[in-house]
Amino acid sequence: MASLKSIKKRIVSVKNTRQITKAMKMVSAAKLRRAQENVVAARPYAKKLGEVLQRLAKSQDESGSPLMQQRLSQKALLIVVTSDRGLCGGFNANICKAAERFIKEKKAEFAEISVTTVGRKGYEFLKNRQKIHKNYGNVLANLSYPAAALLAQEMIEGYIAEEYDEVYILFNAFKSVMSQDITLEKLLPIAPEAASTEEYAPEYIYEPSKGELLAELLPKHIEVQVFKALLESVASEHGARMTAMDSASKNATEMIGKLTLQYNRARQAAITTELMEIISGAESIKG
């Protein structure tokens, strides 16, 4: 049986760990609230912009914008969004595995698949497994629209220069604290959705022309989609870390209980042994 001193040392160590996990849970909860508010605010804007773009795109020839042109798909770019830090359960591992599945499934379709990573964990996992086109580090800690727009603009420039023919983004979409959905979205080329099935579709008067608006809104649409995906990932990360730290704290409490019971039994056994020795010694003196 382990000594009383070693058991007590383990109890102190686990208690210290529990303090850390509880603190991390509280920090993640505070960050999650802010991140969740950002996601909720971004979703309606992204949806409405997509609707406006859809109306414009339906009445335009796709050859009018390079971002809508369908061409022979030979090269693809996959943007993989993970976190910069760990201790968030399977958040990063699940995304990285999904990225590997995508690459494996699309190998026959594309001659070349490049990967852009957002977040240190994804880069560290994929750098020895796949060609990394670029890594964006330290973007998510203080996420801003200009940072997301820069990523989107560099991606658009590469697409126009025909460095790749299709662009996808893979991220964790935020559903709830306990649930994050791995989501794959195709960013480029932009395909106008099928015409509305509604009997009455209102006509809009656009100023300036539809072509000018489309040229302005297409890049903006990509920027917004990238920004929303990053916001979703940040909220998902905090939710996953909060859940993981809560689970770790509960496990630590359970372990402390088991170690305390073990300590009490060991202490009781030691006291019993001492008493037996005292009694034996007393009997020897009497004899």
From Swiss-Prot:
It is a peripheral membrane protein. The keyword Membrane applies. Keywords: ATP synthesis, Cell inner membrane, Cell membrane, CF(1), Hydrogen ion transport, Ion transport, Membrane, Transport. The keyword Zinc does not apply. GO terms for biological process: proton motive force-driven ATP synthesis; proton motive force-driven plasma membrane ATP synthesis. Its main location: membrane. SUPFAM superfamilies: ATP synthase (F1-ATPase), gamma subunit. GO terms for molecular function: ATP binding; proton-transporting ATP synthase activity, rotational mechanism. It comes from the Bacteria. Disulfide bonds: none annotated. One of its GO terms (cellular component) is proton-transporting ATP synthase complex. PROSITE patterns: ATPASE_GAMMA. It is found in: Cell inner membrane. Produces ATP from ADP in the presence of a proton gradient across the membrane. The gamma chain is believed to be important in regulating ATPase activity and the flow of protons through the CF(0) complex. NCBIfam families: ATPsyn_F1gamma. HAMAP family: ATP_synth_gamma_bact. F-type ATPases have 2 components, CF(1) - the catalytic core - and CF(0) - the membrane proton channel. CF(1) has five subunits: alpha(3), beta(3), gamma(1), delta(1), epsilon(1). CF(0) has three main subunits: a, b and c. Belongs to the ATPase gamma chain family. This is ATP synthase gamma chain. It comes from Geobacter sulfurreducens (strain ATCC 51573 / DSM 12127 / PCA). The lineage of its organism: Bacteria, Pseudomonadati, Thermodesulfobacteriota, Desulfuromonadia, Geobacterales.
